Amino acid sequence: MATLKDKLIGHLATSQEPRSYNKITVVGVGAVGMACAISILMKDLADEVALVDVMEDKLKGEMMDLQHGSLFLHTAKIVSGKDYSVSAGSKLVVITAGARQQEGESRLNLVQRNVNIFKFIIPDIVKHSPDCIILVVSNPVDVLTYVAWKLSGLPMHRIIGSGCNLDSARFRYLMGERLGVHSSSCHGWVIGEHGDSSVPVWSGMNVAGVSLKELHPELGTDKDKENWKKLHKDVVDSAYEVIKLKGYTSWAIGLSVADLAETIMKNLCRVHPVSTMVKDFYGIKNDVFLSLPCVLDNHGISNIVKMKLKPDEEQQLQKSATTLWDIQKDLKF
């Protein structure tokens, strides 16, 4: 007997399993993972979004909650699973899973705990999506991007850390607040380590091509009576402040990740400060991942922009690299 569906639908194509062409997987459905997921969904970047986590009840609940909002989205399929087979065929895999940073805890203190988690995550991702781009968000992001590269066996241009994309966004927001100009028209870069030893490029700050350093030579120095140096301190402190106030950060990093995902999925070739292998750049001799301005496309990182840094900025970058290497060299994975 014909079902209601049979009475309603006349079949034209032969029955076949639908294929996903722009699939994105988010690993970890904590506050950051779900902020990434909803930000990606709101930008209509994928025809399928998969969620993966070890907490099955929460995972199913988050999936159902998003599915129930499907009418308001343009992503055809939202799935979830504890098994990484659900992630198969992903173009982009966003990793947010890991131990959460506690109040007052530096990102680098998280390292070994999260390395142990990555040992289980990375091989399964590569097994099911061997051609994917991996975007690492878990902290400490620079070290864990290095770990993901080592564990995955993928070429380095397909392993990206979210890095200083958010630091730079915070920097530009605070810059705009001071100047009364929207952050999209304020240009400034934060490079190096995501977090405590990040490097603000004072020499590159501009609005409409007008160099702030030329207008105000003391910019970013201890001699600056306007204390613009506090801008970078506020960037570094901001995550700790948000964690102190609400227990974790989520929305800004979620929006930052969706920004990166958009550039990758749409092959936009935009420049972002993301974490990549920096060996042989700016006198750095070790295998460390730090943020530099990178051109992103649908293959991952296609190019690195060679910023002209002042000697003190270059020294800070080298110091940042040394800080990370001192931790990396003792990792067990």
From Swiss-Prot:
Kindly list the positions annotated as binding substrate. 107, 139, 170, 249
What is a GO molecular function of this protein?
A: L-lactate dehydrogenase activity
EC annotation from Swiss-Prot or TrEMBL: 1.1.1.27
User: Which residues of the sequence carry a binding annotation for NAD(+)?
Assistant: 30-58, 100, 139
Q: Name one GO biological process term.
A: lactate metabolic process
Name the CDD domains for this protein: LDH_1 (cd05293)
- Show the Gene3D superfamilies listed in the entry: Lactate dehydrogenase/glycoside hydrolase, family 4, C-terminal, NAD(P)-binding Rossmann-like Domain
Q: Which GO terms describe its cellular component?
A: cytoplasm
Q: Does the keyword NAD apply?
A: yes
- List localization entries: Cytoplasm
What cystine pairs are annotated? none
Sequence similarity: Belongs to the LDH/MDH superfamily. LDH family.
Q: What is this protein called?
A: L-lactate dehydrogenase A chain
Upper classification of the organism? Eukaryota, Metazoa, Chordata, Craniata, Vertebrata
Name of encoding gene: ldha
